[in-house]
Amino acid sequence: MEFSSHHIRLLQQLDEQRQKDLFCDCHIIVEGQMFKAHRNVLFASSGYFKMLLSQSCRDMGEPITATFDVFSADTFTAILDFVYSGKLPLSGQNVIEVMSAASYLQMTDVIGVCKMFIKSSLDINEKDRDGFFSLSDKDAGSNGSGLYAAGWRTESSPTHTHDTAEHGSFIAGYNYPPPITSRLQRPFSKHPRKPELVRKHRRRLLPEPLTPAPLSHIPLGDLVGGSAECMLHDEETVESVSQEEERTQTQESIISIKDEDEDAASHSWPESPQQESLDQGPALHITKAEELYKAMPTMLGGVSGWGEDELSSGRFKCPFCTHTVKRKADLKRHLRCHTGERPYPCEACGKRFTRLEHLRNHFQTIHEAGKLICRRCKLPVTKVTGRVIQDGTRRYRLCHACLAEAGLDNVNFDYGEDQPLVLPPENEREHCWNFKEEGRKENGSERAESDLAIQEVVDSEDDELKEKQD
């Protein structure tokens, strides 16, 4: 026999113990504020605490203290309340911070709840945006239709999103014709358009033909007096006139919207043909939003297109900021800055990273730094169990087993000692230097003697010439 309320009472008792500081053996410090909790509860709720507490399971008698600087105290308060009560206080201001902290603490349940909250808020915003791209308020006021005006107010008001058909809610896209009651109330145009021109614009603007609503389903109280009698006496004439008015009104409404909101119309989202799903209550709101906006991006998952303008221009915009990228993979990586997702865990220490290259650098610099590995078998070796081999200019390390298998007997072993430079003895060096200096002196003396001899010869010749002249 099972008691469904047993786990609820158990959580309540644990929460009361935490608030009264009873049996709390784990202290968490966030921004200088201390939070006390039970290590068993944290171990069962968070993957990060599970890894942290499993490493320090030997010190069971002393309380454990952990310090965090990656999130705020208010964010951790919300997460701690969720751990002990199962209730997560989310709002538009703290959903990103809570999701980032939950990703750091490896709490998948909290991440899933935050994803649903963000998706539902985006659905509401895009639904209001879709209502903005419906028929303008100017056209709705000129038609004078109370039924259409009620539908417009229902779509634009966020508090009455799920009205029933009894109150007359009606949602139409910008390419849908107004109800037939508004067309019958409006007086006929004095200058009707030519059928050829109407068919030409209709073929260009509306690829799919529009069929008027059946007149038999319209109550007589919604019609104006003369038009009701005309419908009863000559139904075929009214139907033909309504078709002509439908073409004219549709063309005018589409042209006016195209002129006024040409830029905004390209951003509109497609309407779902199942409009009656809005009348089924708030329970089907998420299903309806998924049907209307199938192009919505999913958080922490595959990112789909974000609008026709981005698909046409080849750029994708972040839904949280103004950052734009060219590839879906870049947008998915950028979203991790807002969501705090870390999908790449380290198998050695459990630390998680947002990018794969950061994980590789961490593993190489932290876990593989300073390790000597055999080049052949890739096993760790030491200076005792391995040797450094120098093959020409290449140097690598092999273990003794690989050396024996390879039969490397005639290989130069490099023990890490630099060979001394081979220089001649000091006596020989001095002799060479003295020899060079003596050679230079001898050459200089020979040159000096030759110069003196030349000068003496020249002087003697000059003296002989002077004597002959005298």
Swiss-Prot record:
For this protein, the record's InterPro entries field holds: BTB/POZ_dom (IPR000210), SKP1/BTB/POZ_sf (IPR011333), Znf_C2H2_sf (IPR036236), Znf_C2H2_type (IPR013087), ZnFinger_BTB_dom_contain (IPR050457)
Q: Where is this region: Disordered?
A: 260-280, 439-470
BP GO annotations = regulation of transcription by RNA polymerase II
Composition skew (Basic and acidic residues), residue ranges: 439-450
Q: Name one GO molecular function term.
A: RNA polymerase II cis-regulatory region sequence-specific DNA binding
Record flagged with keyword Heme: no
* Compositionally biased intervals (Polar residues): 269-278
Role according to the record: May be involved in transcriptional regulation.
Protein name, entry field = Zinc finger and BTB domain-containing protein 8A.1-A
Phylogenetic placement of the source organism: Eukaryota, Metazoa, Chordata, Craniata, Vertebrata
Q: Which gene encodes it?
A: zbtb8a.1-a
